[in-house]
Amino acid sequence: MGGFGNMRYYVYVSDAKLELLLGQIPPKRLSRLAAEFTIDLKLVTMTVQTAAPPEATRYQRLAVVERAIERDEDVSGLEEPSVWFSGKLGLRSMIYGGESTGLLLFTGMWNGTVIALIGSAHHLIGSGAAPEAVPIGYSGSMLPTFFTLLERDQAEWDDRHQVQESNRPLTRRDRPSDQQSLQQVIDCAEQITGPRQGYEFLARRLLLGTRLDPDGWPVRVLIGTPLYVALSGESR
């Protein structure tokens, strides 16, 4: 895992998660964590409102939150994912909806497991090329599945107003089951083309399960929502 001072080239940082998780750290402990990185506590505790925080402040906040997660949570790899999991993997990406108002999907394969990371596209950062955006309407799209999954993460669900069409309430008819969500993520991953990019990430687990492929073989699916995604040399 990393920390402030470790060189990373971030492409995605969830300010919504940073805000929520910072608020859950007791003040005395937050002060000690900030001191470990020689960070001004006032910058760490700055409230994110309409504008995104300066990049330096964002990364300082991320360093503190990541350290707290490392120490307090069971952070696993991809083999036996716990509540938080991390990895380095070659992923493809796609935005469903507008480039700044859509939902973002990173997806790849790891030892026969489909890995899918879902988040809001407005958390994309950096100067790299943005993933391809597909203008898909709500009906008949992946959006009901994505929104249903993101309901399991308080920060992303509270942040859903940033995403187009998210103000439409999900009805029971719209809301897919876990098995339907797993299958739709598999189908979506198969439709994303283009080269894989090597990334490293830390994500919160949303759903883990297995579906049978057309030949009857089990396909394991791990779906999460990332705190951050950064470039790495891994491309498999």
Put a short name on every predicted segment.
Residues 1-29, 50-111:
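Membrane pore-forming effector domains from diverse proteins
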Residues 5, 10-11, 38, 147, ...:
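Compositionally biased, low-structure terminal segments
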Residues 11, 32-35, 61-64, 70, ...:
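Sequence-pattern detector for short linear motifs
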Residues 29-52:
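Polybasic, Ser/Thr-rich amphipathic helices
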Residues 93-236:
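Long, helix-rich, hydrophobic modules that act as membrane-proximal anchors or helical bundle/coiled-coil regulators
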